[in-house]
Amino acid sequence: MFSLQKKALQHIYMTPEDASDLTNDLLQHLGLYWNGPIIKMDTVVHLHNKMFSNQSVLKYALAKQANIKILETLVLWVEPEYALAQALKHNRKDVIECIFSHHLTTPSYHHIMHLTSSQELFEFFHLFICKSKNYHARMECLLYAATLYNFQNILEKNREYIVRHSIGNALFAIACKERHIHLIAWFATAGVFDTYDDSTLFNTAFRLGDYSLLEVACDLPITYPDHLIISMMQTAIQKNYFRFFKKLLTHFNVYRPIIITDAAYYNRRKILLLLFNQNIFNNFTILCALSAAIKGHASKKTLNLLINRLDAQMTVIDSVYYSIVKYNNIDCIPLLRHLKTFRIETLLSIAIHNNNIDIITACKAFLSKDKLYYLVLKMAIISRNDKLFKLYTEQENPMYIFTTMKTIISDLISHTVFQALAIECLREFHQEKQLPIASLLMVLAEHNYITKFKKACYAANMSDQKVKQALIKCLFIAAQKNCCQIFKYCFGSLLKVLSKHERNKFFNAVVFARKLASYDDHQEMIHLIDSLIKGFRYLIKD
């Protein structure tokens, strides 16, 4: 059979404290139709072998719109906070008045204000719970609470007060934090700001990761400066908020090179694809982005995306090379080789200048041994990097290094300062490795380093047949190069050590040297040789 008792129990599910007598009349007013003994037991009521909490009885009474007299009794059985919360939920102003009449000193109940949906009751309740006696303090407290709990009509009613006391910005910040979308829109259009900070709503949207807040900010009838939109785009890139970035890009249609550079640096490939679809960035901007991607150690996919967007003939800018070296990004080198204008020699030179051994080693895979050693030794000499020079010469065949350095010295002929450095470096290397003196003499003769040539001759064993042959070769070199001092010194040195039999052969060599000088029309050298030959004939006759 249908049981009113069971039906009533379905509505009883909360809990209270403090009990008083219940009567049959009271229960009938509440809609509970039981007969039998009623026993009070602390926080519960015992009716006909059934237990009911005081809180559940109060809640049921409010739900059934019970008489105020009954409710006046029931609110005394429970804690004031619970009674107030239930009264707010059911929008019972009379019950709230009753509760406060019994509890003149109450703690702050701001945290339960939001339980009511009535503006009038919200304001009425605030009158009781606000402790301040100052009117302005009470008003600001009410407006902060109204903003916190999304009571727009209260704010609208007090708009003039908000403007007059310049609290619009502070209230707006609360609305943003609580994500009250409609309230935010009202603030932005109601003209209540003292000085509106355009970034407040955007910053809050990013801080909370709330896309709906960003949409509100974009749709507000406000003209934002471009620098703010760019800044927000950069924030979206940093946080990897693709939806945020897309919304800003499509809504405001603002583009700057810094956007693509940041996207490359933070390895945001989806954002890069979105930007490339706009077809507005030139090759130079993409190269700058590539440099940023290298700096940020972006993935190979991101690097390939940037490289594939470049014109194959576009000259690679220095910042790309410097980024590879500075940030030691070895992985990008094979990818950049696909660019026709990428110069591994340039990269190697910068790596040597910055003493980046890792990049230098990585370049080995893309250069022949001769080319690698030529570039490394040349830059090591020019930059006076003794450590690098020793690193690449200690384990290698000394004669191979000597030959490579000869080529370097010849190529530096138009750079006398650097050539002098290379000559000195070669001389020290030759001395350290104790190589045959003949090879050094010929290099010094070829480049007309007379002082170093003389020093080398002093250190040489002039009676050694190989040294004599080297000096004769130096004669020929000097004749061809028009190095008169070298020729004269070699001539005099050989006369001192040659036997009579050797002098006859030497005379023929001098005559041949004159022919070499005449081929290039070195008149000064020809006159010098003629004068030497004239005196030499007398020596032979003797």
From Swiss-Prot:
UniProt keywords, alphabetically: Early protein
Domain of life per record: Viruses
Induction conditions: Expressed in the early phase of the viral replicative cycle.
UniProt key word Metal-binding: no
InterPro entries attached to this UniProt entry: MGF_505
The keyword Amino-acid biosynthesis belongs to this UniProt entry's keyword annotation: no
A Pfam family this chain is assigned to: DUF249
Family in the record: Belongs to the asfivirus MGF 505 family.
Function according to Swiss-Prot or TrEMBL: Plays a role in virus cell tropism, and may be required for efficient virus replication in macrophages.
Protein name: Protein MGF 505-11L
Species this chain originates from: African swine fever virus (isolate Pig/Kenya/KEN-50/1950) (ASFV)
